[in-house]
Amino acid sequence: MEMLKAEVKPAVGCTEPVALALACAKAKELLGEEIVENRMLVSPSIYKNGMCVGIPGTERLGLKIAAALGIVGGHSENGLSVLETLTKEEVKIAEDYMDNTPLSITPADTREKVFIEVVLKGKNHIAKVRIRTKHDNFTFLEKDGEVLLDNEPKVSASNDAAEKAESLMDTVTIQELIKNVEEIDFKDIEFLLDGVKMNEEMAEYGLKQKTGIGVGYGIKKSIEEGLLGNDVINYAMMLTAGASDARMAGVKMPVMSSNGSGNHGLTAILPIVAYNKKFPQSDERLAKALAISHLVTGYIKNYTGRLSAVCGCGVAASTGATAGISWLMNGTEKQIEGAIENMIADLSGMICDGAKAGCALKLSSAASAAIQSAIIAKQDCFVPPLNGIVGSSVEQSIQNLGRVSDKGMSITDEIILNVMNDMNKVD
């Protein structure tokens, strides 16, 4: 329950630039005066994911406008919804601020996945803020040399071990997670249904008109024209892509996130919603399927890292969704584990080249694979042990996926960032 409440929460805007906006808002609040100098360091993963994505309330893209919005009108007490209350006037002021004020945002020399440091200087004061391990986790606050908060994690030189050290996922099995969910009182997880409403509303926005690159809208039109069938897989693709189209375009609406990511939330929730629309279940069963999805997503992220070179929607959140769907299908233990391993065998190589409009394509593929993996597992069709990176147990398969995603693709992540930098010429 503690993990669900900590990792499933509303967010407005792509989580990486929102995290920078949150840090900037906090630093400005600490400073308490006009800013004359700024310096921002972000981990390469934050830098990559914030480079090309739309920001709610403005047509501009990227980290600089997110930082400006946080400085001008952000309220840190709103957490990952820090940009939700900005007025049109504040957005215009932030855009002018960005145009007329040098904003220093550079990649930090760190292997941590989630690291943000903001230093703001005024005429009389200086404020420093750090966020580490999680997008809304303030670990260090300082004003004029006085340390107000020091909760810095110990992070190894090679990975984000601080985040992993917090997790209980190393000691439980997938079946233990599922059994725990089955025993939870419905009232304790009823809040998960709020995510259904939020994420469906974002999907509806992206399906009403061509938003972003219009992946969801294109699937919807193709279903209406008879080019695609109105089956559960295409419906899941349409819903999930439509929501991502809108979110990546910067539509100012909240979504329910999962494990620090709004797109993870879309992928962990909407394929299950699509299955539930076609094959209705009780609210209690739907909530428990969502709980399984979020927890399996977190289980996988424990090994792959919160941010990595692989698409977390493709390898983690969609795998959580397939587990939830398989459970809704009354799958046996073997079938649920088989659905998970089908996903690992399918989408494990999908790269993450930052948050952007094209994410809708990846979420569409992830939603399709999630439904497909659960459907064929229900027919006892799954990848056998010791086949590729699929191990002798589902837990070993997930650990193998983590090794490939974290250690195996660290150089890939560097190259992706270099390629994006060369094209975008971001300072």
UniProtKB/Swiss-Prot annotation:
It holds the Pfam family SDH_alpha. GO terms for molecular function: L-cysteine desulfhydrase activity. It comes from the Bacteria. GO terms for biological process: L-cysteine catabolic process to pyruvate. InterPro entries: Ser_deHydtase-like_asu, UPF0597. Belongs to the UPF0597 family. HAMAP family: UPF0597 (MF_01845). This is UPF0597 protein CD630_32320.
